[in-house]
A protein has these predicted regions:
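Expand to "…catalyze enediolate/carbanion chemistry for C-C bond making/breaking, isomerization
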Residues: 1-190
């Protein structure tokens, strides 16, 4: 089936690969698997190999509730830092789109949401789920390259294209092939 408006499906409560594959086979749309339980976390590797999977996300509130994590505690923060890193590594290892951050439930606390969005952007996440219209601009800004990042990337790529050198310095920063590739990616995404 071809869909003109729908470009993908966020599938909640994923616990096994076959759920992702069933939705993909039925709808022929890329799937974002939302991991929301200990069972789902334990199956991350298998889920990441699902046919039709585009990206992983997670449900912070459901996981916190199931595991009886104390909301706002350092322990809860540590748990989700670990989970984010695990999801990011599994996504990279299986060539998925970078993960999508869970919702930020306190939609009136724009400062805290901005900090969270910036943090997960720095971790290499590709976006963030939003539950309120006021969150959309905050998320969009967090996952957009800054003017200074774009300017630096442009200088790097211009120097690389002009000289062919794969090791050089720009603005006192050592540049080698991984930095060049990162700059190319940044400019392509902008």
């Amino acid at each position: 089936a071809e869909h003109e408006v729908i470009s993908g499906i966020v599938l909640p409560k994923v616990t096994k690969a076959s759920q992702v594959e069933l939705v993909f086979e039925s709808l022929k749309l890329p799937v974002v698997a939302q991991i929301e339980s200990a069972q789902g976390i334990s199956q991350l590797e298998a889920i990441a190999q699902s046919e039709g999977l585009m990206a992983l996300s997670y449900g912070r509130l459901d996981i916190s509730n199931e595991l009886d994590l104390t909301a706002g505690s350092q322990a809860e923060q540590d748990f989700f830092t670990h989970l984010r890193i695990q999801i990011r590594l599994v996504s990279q290892a299986h060539n998925l789109t970078a993960p999508i951050e869970s919702i930020y439930a306190d939609f009136k606390n724009e400062t805290a949401m901005k900090a969270t969005a910036g943090y997960v952007s720095d971790l290499g996440f590709s976006g963030m789920l939003c539950i309120h219209p006021r969150q959309v601009n905050i998320a969009n800004q967090a996952f957009k390259a800054s003017d200074s990042q774009l300017a630096f990337a442009t200088k790097v790529i211009e120097h690389y294209q002009k000289t062919g050198d794969s090791t050089f310095a720009i603005e006192g920063v050592m540049v080698d092939l991984p930095v060049i590739l990162q700059c190319q990616r940044l400019l392509q995404q902008s």
